[in-house]
């Protein structure tokens, strides 16, 4: 906006565009007064009522554009005065009169929109009126009114920005609109409201403040009631978000500094000091009793908000010449980031505990899914630990840096242990044994006092926890060794061939084994086996064992046959006598 409207010509062109749009809008609403004689009595714009707006919101748009046209005219004159002082007093009077006309249209707009149901739209109308009122008060050097007007404007703009910033899961087109609104609000705040508010504070003797934080000042003076017609907007905001307009009680003793390790830094922002007090008060946050990761989201968002506040404060004071203040702000930045990252660590560790408890009584496949998520979370935790080590000032603190190194080793070891248990669930016991043995060897050489510092924020780890984990490792290694040995023995049996002919130590004991005497699927070469016949082989072909008959039957038949043959031979005188094998003794 500031880049688009930078010269008197720019303001003049924009004013002409608005005049054309206003003329068209007045025709649409039938607000044209052709007879200009005695115009004040005949003109219709001043007679617009809330009922007209309730029927058609274009009546409100007409008044808003009318106020903007007069405001542009005053800015055009101001730009001319910056170039030349010719007729300065008359131009100045004209400029103030145009601001007054703009304010009059703004007040009329507030009157007719009293029944507007959209409270955010009403807040925008009041914000615009507060900006015009503040501009008029500054030009008339009415500093108390200027302080009240710009305080109201700043509270309203901060509220609108927070509402836009909280929008989530929006479509791409809405996201572009939201981003534009946030950019516009930021530019108005930085280029108009903050400089004007700072000027009003410096000029108003009654506006003594112990802080240079404009947000805190605006909350202190937004209820001054110097401009009663603007006060309803504070009540509207308070109904939606009371904290947006709540004042830090004067009875509350704010902390003046923060301590990070051996460094102490002064706080120059009351809002920052107040919110740090709330977040670091263990009795108020009660984080020690948190047993759910979602409960830590409040702390996480709190530290993130502090980081945003302090970053904006540093951006506004980036040209600070006071080296002590620059150093204090750098220490506070490290302090906030340090606690923010440890809050994230604690939240992730609680999620791991929840996943571990859920995976205790489930099947192996489901437990593997839980372990996969746990390993991923440990990867995030290790990355966060590395971010903490990279913070300014950490490397120079030997005890802290060494403790963070060991903290990273501890998380790596716990991640490896989960990985080893996952291998064991997959029956990969040798791999699990290797991992457990590696973890045991890595941590066995550690000192008795693993962490050199007394404690970490939110107690993310301790020497007692490490010693307990270290003592459990040998039993886990032994268990992995036993399972790995069983796995090796089992694999030996499983690797033996099913075919009897290929395994001399395997004997056929079932039909299944008998079916696998040999593997004929292999490429075989069949060849005759050389053999030498013996006398028994020849004689075997002539031996008759009775074809399976009983021995008594064979003996009786043999005796009967012998008797019959001898009788026949005796009765046959003509039978020839033969020798051995019919060769010798023939007659």
UniProtKB/Swiss-Prot annotation:
InterPro entries to which the protein is assigned, alphabetical: SRP68, SRP68-RBD, SRP68_N_sf
Biased composition (Low complexity): 553-571
Location, primary (coarse class): cytoplasm
Record-level GO BP terms: SRP-dependent cotranslational protein targeting to membrane
Compartments where located: Cytoplasm; Nucleus, Nucleolus; Endoplasmic reticulum
Alphabetical keyword list: Cytoplasm, Endoplasmic reticulum, Nucleus, Ribonucleoprotein, RNA-binding, Signal recognition particle
Residues covered by region (Disordered): 553-578
GO cellular component: endoplasmic reticulum; nucleolus; signal recognition particle, endoplasmic reticulum targeting
Family, per entry: Belongs to the SRP68 family.
Function: Component of the signal recognition particle (SRP) complex, a ribonucleoprotein complex that mediates the cotranslational targeting of secretory and membrane proteins to the endoplasmic reticulum (ER). The SRP complex interacts with the signal sequence in nascent secretory and membrane proteins and directs them to the membrane of the ER. The SRP complex targets the ribosome-nascent chain complex to the SRP receptor (SR), which is anchored in the ER, where SR compaction and GTPase rearrangement drive cotranslational protein translocation into the ER.
UniProt name for this protein: Signal recognition particle subunit SRP68
Organism: Debaryomyces hansenii (strain ATCC 36239 / CBS 767 / BCRC 21394 / JCM 1990 / NBRC 0083 / IGC 2968)
Name of encoding gene: SRP68
């Amino acid at each position: 906006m500031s880049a688009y409207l930078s010269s008197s010509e720019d303001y003049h062109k924009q004013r002409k565009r608005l005049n054309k749009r206003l003329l068209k809008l007045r025709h649409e609403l039938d607000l044209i007064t052709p007879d200009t004689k005695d115009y004040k009595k005949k003109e219709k714009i001043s007679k617009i009522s809330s009922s007209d707006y309730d029927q058609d919101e274009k009546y409100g748009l007409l008044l808003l554009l009318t106020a903007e046209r007069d405001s542009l005219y005053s800015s055009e004159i101001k730009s001319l005065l910056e170039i030349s002082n010719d007729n300065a007093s008359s131009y100045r009077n004209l400029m103030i009169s145009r601001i007054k006309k703009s304010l009059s249209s703004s007040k009329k707009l507030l009157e007719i929109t009293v029944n507007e149901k959209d409270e955010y739209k009403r807040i925008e109308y009041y914000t615009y009126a507060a900006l015009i009122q503040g501009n008029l008060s500054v030009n008339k050097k009415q500093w108390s009114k200027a302080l009240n007007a710009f305080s109201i404007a700043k509270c309203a703009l901060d509220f609108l920005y927070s509402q836009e910033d909280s929008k989530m899961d929006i479509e791409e087109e809405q996201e572009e609109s939201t981003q534009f609104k946030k950019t516009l609000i930021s530019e108005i705040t930085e280029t108009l409201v903050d400089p004007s508010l700072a000027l009003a504070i410096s000029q108003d003797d009654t506006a003594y403040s112990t802080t240079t934080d404009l947000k805190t000042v605006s909350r202190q003076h937004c209820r001054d009631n110097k401009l009663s017609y603007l006060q309803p907007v504070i009540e509207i905001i308070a109904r939606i978000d009371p904290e947006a307009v709540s004042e830090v009680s004067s009875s509350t003793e704010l902390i003046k500094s923060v301590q990070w390790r051996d460094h102490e830094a002064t706080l120059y922002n009351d809002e920052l000091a107040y919110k740090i007090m709330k977040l670091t008060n263990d009795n108020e946050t009660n984080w020690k009793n948190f047993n759910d990761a979602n409960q830590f989201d409040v702390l996480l968002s709190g530290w993130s908000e502090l980081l945003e506040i302090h970053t904006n404060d540093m951006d506004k004071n980036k040209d600070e010449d006071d080296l002590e203040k620059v150093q204090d702000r750098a220490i506070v930045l490290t302090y906030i980031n340090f606690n923010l990252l440890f809050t994230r660590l604690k939240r992730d560790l609680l999620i791991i505990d929840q996943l571990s408890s859920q995976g205790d009584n489930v099947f192996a496949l489901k437990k593997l899914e839980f372990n996969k998520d746990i390993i991923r979370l440990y990867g995030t935790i290790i990355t966060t630990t590395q971010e903490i080590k990279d913070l300014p000032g950490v490397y120079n603190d030997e005890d802290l840096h060494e403790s963070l190194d060991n903290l990273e080793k501890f998380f790596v070891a716990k991640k490896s242990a989960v990985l080893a248990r996952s291998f064991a669930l997959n029956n990969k016991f040798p791999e699990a044994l290797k991992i457990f043995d590696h973890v045991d060897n890595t941590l066995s050489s550690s000192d008795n006092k693993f962490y050199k510092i007394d404690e970490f924020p939110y107690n993310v780890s301790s020497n007692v926890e490490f010693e307990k984990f270290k003592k459990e490792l040998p039993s886990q290694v032994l268990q992995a060794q036993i399972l790995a040995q069983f796995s090796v023995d089992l694999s030996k049996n499983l690797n033996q061939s099913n075919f009897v002919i290929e395994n001399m130590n395997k004997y056929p004991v079932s039909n299944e084994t008998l079916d696998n005497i040999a593997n004929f699927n292999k490429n075989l070469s069949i060849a005759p086996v050389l053999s030498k016949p013996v006398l028994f082989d020849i004689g075997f072909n002539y031996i008759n064992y009775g074809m399976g008959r009983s021995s008594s039957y064979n003996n009786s038949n043999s005796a009967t046959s012998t008797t019959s043959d001898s009788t026949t031979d005796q009765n046959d005188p003509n039978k020839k006598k033969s020798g051995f094998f019919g060769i010798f003794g023939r007659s």
